[in-house]
Amino acid sequence: SLVVMAILARLLCPDDFGTVAIATVFINFFSIFTNIGISSAIVQNKELTSLDINRIYMFTVWIGIILSALFFSSTGFIANYYQDNRLLPICQLLSVNLFFASAGTVPNTLFFKDKDFKFIAWRTFIIQILVGALAIVAALMGAGLYTLLIQPILSSALIYFISLRKYPQKLLWTWGIDSLKKIWAYSMYQFLFSVMSYFIRNLDKMLIGKYIGMAPLGYYEKSYRLMSLPIQNITYVITPVLHPILSDYQKEEKRLATINERMVRLLAFIGFPLGILLFFCGRELMLFVFGPQWEPSIPTFQILSLSVGLQIVMSSSGSF
């Protein structure tokens, strides 16, 4: 993903990245409601039957259809608010992503519940190479900012179809509310955490895009993405693996506390020195990865890098 990001940064302008960043902010908000903590609750709950799983799957399918329609219908408001007509087709295309993200929640979660991490790793690796290559080809052919839509849309679609093939679900004429009630007590807290996390991580981009402009947002988004790479790689590796494993010890509070303490120490040992290193090497790293046209992103990247240590330490908290 870093290689693809570096190549696209040399083929597209900051304004393109800023425009897509705004669309991504809104799609991420709707994405919160595609999951509502269901994935974590399915992993945690050991008493769900196959029928419960199927009914919850149907709930996510209906929610995906509704959210896609709502986001599609709100694209005009988003484009008018930011006074950028390019946002209209971009957001409309991304609305498809909501359906795949929602409908794929249950079958994708079953990989983690069954601890099939090897398959997940290979699936992610192959999809990243495929969609990354397609994005680069599209950029070279002059697709412009639409290049940046290839990865999110194709990735979610491929993950959905691969997961559904591995864990097929029947189409039932139900909302699955009775089965959803079995996990709601747990999933509700995960959902509220996701809502809080969303505004903490996205409010800055919304304000920059509205009051400063798309090009400055592009510079900010690029520095933020580069800063987030080590955090995301650690989070995406640790959290999905920890949660299904720790769920086996959910009644052993002392053991969980000991594991949490060791995890925090390890992440602090990695995170804080890494943040300091990124701060002092920020200029060289930014120019090497993205090229000279992204030089205005350097001060922002250096400031953001100071938070890397704390964010890495907190990255595993959701698993506990």
PLM region spans:
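Membrane-water interface segments that mark the loop-to-transmembrane alpha-helix transition
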Residues: 1, 23, 28, 32-76, ...
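Signature of the first transmembrane helix
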Residues: 1-38, 62-75, 92, 127-136, ...
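Helix-terminus/linker motif at the lipid-water interface of multi-pass membrane proteins
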Residues: 2-16, 79-81, 139, 198-229, ...
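Helix-loop junctions and terminal segments of transmembrane helices
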Residues: 33-50, 112-113, 223, 227-271, ...
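C-terminal transmembrane helix end/exit motif
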Residues: 39, 106-113, 117, 137-141, ...
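Alpha-helical transmembrane segments of multi-pass membrane transporters/permeases
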Residues: 50, 54, 60, 91-92, ...
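Alpha-helical transmembrane segments of multi-pass membrane transport and lipid-handling proteins
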Residues: 58-83, 89, 93, 133-141, ...
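Interhelical loop/hinge segments that connect adjacent transmembrane helices in multipass membrane
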Residues: 118, 161-206, 241-258
